[in-house]
């Protein structure tokens, strides 16, 4: 009996030890990687396996979010997500929209609660919060492609550190197609960036256009009935499609801020109506002392703001006020009057006004309304942020020295320093001024793309290449603030595994190891691939024929690659109004193997395995009389050279995202087509 009792004690002790050890070694899921980073995470054991069903609790608005989520889920993972009613079962995803005060207090306007157990539940007190919760689930899902799109069990209560998280696109100097803006809305939503500012008018720099304002590039991009002929001829948006863009953005939780920039950066308006241009400060400045200026600008804003269903649907409208001259006291006071007038004019239509910070640069006595006015603080010499806070403005942190992208300009950033921003910046840092985190005066942060050098060869694909890593980085810093816990090395490595957005691939990235092979390419043939992005190699063997000028090898919606370009009959490519050519012609009866490679800096041609030519950046100089260098003559008969020492230069880009959608109508015999991407 005693022996049996001892055996029982040993068995009991063993069982207890086993239980303790198993509990101690149980695998609790670490915080999963998403962008922006979850503010907090409570891990659990195991994985959630999706059933492909979802349940909605919360009325019509919740149903609309669920439909959007289901469509994006299908696009992203390739599997349907269908609705069901009744009690959720294991593997179901539940979307809950609660409007009670407790949820609103805990989650705020954009927060959500995500619980992943046998059932996954997204709970929010607002439509925006519910949308953001679905973005988290989508990002978690796509990282588990090889495991069947399972989700790590655990829970989070996630809400942003800053209420405004955004980006500004200069569409005035460089036309950005509506198709890209629609993709951009989806990308921003996927990374919980909630503000897209569209800069609708601007102009190039006069020195690149013969120092002639009349010849200098300028554009206003929106359809305009009030002033027929004002709208740009080289690319514009109809009012109907601009409204549809805003509706799409509303679905995705993104606010569109349209910007009409006055009274500087206004050459498009003075091209149309020269009498309102300033003869003293330049025709890119409106004449603030001319009553016709105010009639014109009033009429312009009114067209987009009046009526029950205005073209500008959102709550905020940006009136510009950027970089006007402060040369004289009287012009400073008139600028302040102009700014105050248009803040109040926009408000008269029920909108909130936004301005570029300029009131330190234009310091004066004329009062400018500050209550409920949004100010973009971009350069502290133009608007001292602490003084603007004291005056009562609501600030947007967009410091030029940190978050301005000016593609290929040679100043500001070509690509943002994402490591510095990730490690060291939050919206509380405006230039050299540091505010407390979550200071109530700071609405949030943005970055910007300014296309200063109109005509420099930069394409939308080049802009996208610069924009996307910045978007991911600013997303993290504007949502999570100073509380990021992942190292930049980990962030920078894992961000590459995430999509741009469901069904969006503007960079034309291919899956690792993917290739396109075509044994014989026939005229007019479609390939099943639209294009291939940077890091590509396109190789083929060609037995040349007599190809007329304009003969196409491949084309897509974005670009055309020529066997014989339309101007000179050389190998070349065209996109967005630019034509670039290699110094090479396809020769009749000659058989060669050609390869074209391309990255974000250059496009290269190889002939029979040897590099023939690289089309990299070209430095172009603006020659002006003031740059003429003078030399002392040794005597009256000595020859004097004409030498320029130009300070203004442009770096013309010759990159290409290679088109593959459709073969052209060529005569040459083309075989062995092979396309790959690093």
Where do the PLM segments sit?
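Bacterial N-terminal signal peptides that target proteins for export
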Residues: 2-13
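Acidic, contiguous N-terminal accessory segments
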Residues: 6, 23-160, 353-362, 369, ...
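Bacterial N-terminal signal peptides
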Residues: 13-22
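Feature activates predominantly on carbohydrate-active enzymes
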Residues: 105-285, 292, 298-316, 451-453
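Hydrophobic faces of well-ordered beta-strands that scaffold small-molecule active sites
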Residues: 165-169, 196-198, 256-260, 315-319, ...
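Active-site neighborhood of glycoside hydrolase catalytic domains
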Residues: 269, 274-372, 378-391
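Flexible, acidic glycine-rich loops studded with aromatic residues
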Residues: 367-373, 380-519
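Extracellular glycan-associated modules
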Residues: 509-678
């Amino acid at each position: 009996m005693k022996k049996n009792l001892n055996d029982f004690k040993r068995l009991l002790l063993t069982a207890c030890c086993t239980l303790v050890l198993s509990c101690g070694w149980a695998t609790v899921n670490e915080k999963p990687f998403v962008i922006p980073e979850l503010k907090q995470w409570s891990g659990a054991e195991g994985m959630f396996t999706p059933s492909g069903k979802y349940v909605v609790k919360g009325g019509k608005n919740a149903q609309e979010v669920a439909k959007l989520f289901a469509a994006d889920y299908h696009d992203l993972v390739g599997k349907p997500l269908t609705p069901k009613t009744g009690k959720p079962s294991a593997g179901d995803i539940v979307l809950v929209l609660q409007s009670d005060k407790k949820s609103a207090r805990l989650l705020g306007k954009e927060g959500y609660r995500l619980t992943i157990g046998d059932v996954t539940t997204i709970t929010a007190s607002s439509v925006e919060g519910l949308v953001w919760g679905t973005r988290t689930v989508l990002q978690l899902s796509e990282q588990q492609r090889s495991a069947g799109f399972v989700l790590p069990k655990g829970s989070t209560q996630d809400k942003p550190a800053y209420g405004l998280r955004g980006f500004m696109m200069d569409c005035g100097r460089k036309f950005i197609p509506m198709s890209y803006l629609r993709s951009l809305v989806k990308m921003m939503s996927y990374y919980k960036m909630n503000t897209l500012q569209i800069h609708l008018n601007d102009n190039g720099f006069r020195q690149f256009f013969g120092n002639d304002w009349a010849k200098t590039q300028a554009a206003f991009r929106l359809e305009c009935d009030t002033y027929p002929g004002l709208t740009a001829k080289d690319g514009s948006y109809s009012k109907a499609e601009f409204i549809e863009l805003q509706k799409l953005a509303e679905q995705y939780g993104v606010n569109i801020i349209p910007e009409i920039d006055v009274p500087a950066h206004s050459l498009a308006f003075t091209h149309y109506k020269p009498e309102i241009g300033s003869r003293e400060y330049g025709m890119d400045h409106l004449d603030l002392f001319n009553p016709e200026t105010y009639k014109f600008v009033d009429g312009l804003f009114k067209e987009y703001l009046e009526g029950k269903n205005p073209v500008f649907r959102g709550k905020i409208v940006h009136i510009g006020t950027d970089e006007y001259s402060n040369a004289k006291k009287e012009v400073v006071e008139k600028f302040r009057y102009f700014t105050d007038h248009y803040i109040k004019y926009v408000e008269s239509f029920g909108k909130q006004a936004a301005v570029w910070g300029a009131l330190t640069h234009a310091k004066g006595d004329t009062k400018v309304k500050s209550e409920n006015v949004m100010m973009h603080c971009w350069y502290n010499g133009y608007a001292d942020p602490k003084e603007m806070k004291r005056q009562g403005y609501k600030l947007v942190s967009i410091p030029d020295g940190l978050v301005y992208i000016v593609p290929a300009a040679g100043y500001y950033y070509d690509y943002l320093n994402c490591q510095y921003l990730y490690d060291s910046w939050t919206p509380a840092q405006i230039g050299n001024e540091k505010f407390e985190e979550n200071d109530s005066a700071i609405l949030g942060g943005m970055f910007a793309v300014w296309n200063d050098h109109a005509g420099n060869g930069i394409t939308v694909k080049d802009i996208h290449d610069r924009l996307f890593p910045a978007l991911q980085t600013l997303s993290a810093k504007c949502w999570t603030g100073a509380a990021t816990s992942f190292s930049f090395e980990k962030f920078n490595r894992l961000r590459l595994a995430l999509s741009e957005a469901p069904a969006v691939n503007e960079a034309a990235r291919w899956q690792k190891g993917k290739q396109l092979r075509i044994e014989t390419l026939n005229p007019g043939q479609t390939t099943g691939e639209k294009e291939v992005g940077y890091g590509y190699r396109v190789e083929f063997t060609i037995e040349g024929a007599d190809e007329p000028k304009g003969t196409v090898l491949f084309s897509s919606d974005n670009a055309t690659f020529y066997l014989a370009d339309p101007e000179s009959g050389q190998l070349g490519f065209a996109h967005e109004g630019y034509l670039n050519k290699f110094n090479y012609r396809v020769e009749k009866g000659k058989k060669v193997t050609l390869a074209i490679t391309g990255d974000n800096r250059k496009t290269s041609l190889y002939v029979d395995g040897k590099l023939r030519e690289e089309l990299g950046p070209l430095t172009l100089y603006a020659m002006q009389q003031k740059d003429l260098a003078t030399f002392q003559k040794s005597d009256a008969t000595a020859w004097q050279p004409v030498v320029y020492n130009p300070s203004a230069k442009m770096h013309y880009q010759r990159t290409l995202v290679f088109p593959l959608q459709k073969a052209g109508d060529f005569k040459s015999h083309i075989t062995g087509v092979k396309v790959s991407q690093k």
